[in-house]
Amino acid sequence: MHGLCTHGFVCRGLIEALIPGEPEKARRMACRFSKTLYPGDPIKTLIWKTEDGSAVWRTINAKTDELIIDNGIFEYGDIPKDEVRFDDRVAIVTGAGAGLGRAYAVELAKRGAKVVVNDLGGSRDGSGDGAATPADEVVKEIKDMGGEAVANYDNVATPDGGENVVKTAIDAFGTVDILINNAGILRDKSMVKMEPENWNAVMNVHLNGSYHVTQPAFKVMREKGYGRIIMTTSAAGMYGNFGQTNYGAAKLALVGFMNTLKLEGQKSNIKVNTIAPIAASRLTEDVLPAEMLEKSKPEMVVPMTLYLCSERCPVSGNIYNAGMGGYSRTAMMTG
């Protein structure tokens, strides 16, 4: 988690130095970690501009001058005119009433997609009766800018809820091309205080909820021979985070879900990938430091996610970290 955050802070520094106020022009960043960096260690990034649109960089420990990150490459420039489009595509985004889900839904609609905005309207821990307002507000925002969208208020934690989300897409737009499993809740407790109710509530939304929506959507995609599915994992699942055994277990389980689903979808041109976002949202507002929240706008996760949802995406079964202007891939290896 700390290495991922360091990567994000460095990317932010590169953007401020080379393309201030224009983070959307960041095109590519690559590097190699040479030494372990511990929480609280100060860092300094050295940048050499090699040519227009390109720079090399390295990061050192500002206290000891030890090399932390080497072989850094940063490329930047204007966005290509042939932008990724989703004309005539139908997308479902769960948990889309605010934060990341809203950002996904709005940008998909801007680029031509017809969007089902699913949001139960409950609180961060999933409690409460829910309210239609969050989903309706996002739908209104999309329609006001000339896009097409419908709201859905079903709870993905139930099989019927998942079926109804997909049914909403079929009834409104006739099909499903894209599914972003984004809905989530938190019930943080240390293991000795983790009651079955809190364990199951988190599993039911994150893991079971993704299954409840993905299965009916996958059937439609397989029949038509096309689909893009996004799972959402977390550093808490890949590396652990105190007090989040339920959340971490659910989030890493989604990686296993992806690994098998990519095989089942291969013959039908269904790509399944996973995003590990760092973004300011109702789930992270009291988890991430205030300084990180200010630099972690949900919109900075959107480009990677939308690319994985597009026809251009050639990969399936990968995990991508996204946030704070930086993108990288996480891979599990043996040996």
Question: Language-model segments: which ranges?
Answer:
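Residue(s) in the substrate-gating loop at a strand-loop-helix junction
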Residues: 234
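A glycine-rich helix->loop->beta "capping" turn
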Residues: 145-148, 168-181, 187, 226, ...
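HotDog/MaoC-like acyl-thioester-processing domains
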Residues: 28, 33-40, 44-82
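Substrate-binding pocket helix/loop in short-chain dehydrogenase/reductase
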Residues: 190-191, 195-200
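C-terminal helical subdomain
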Residues: 274, 292-335
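Canonical Rossmann dinucleotide-binding motif of NAD(H)/NADP(H)-dependent dehydrogenases/reductases
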Residues: 83-116
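Active-site helix of classical SDR
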Residues: 214, 250
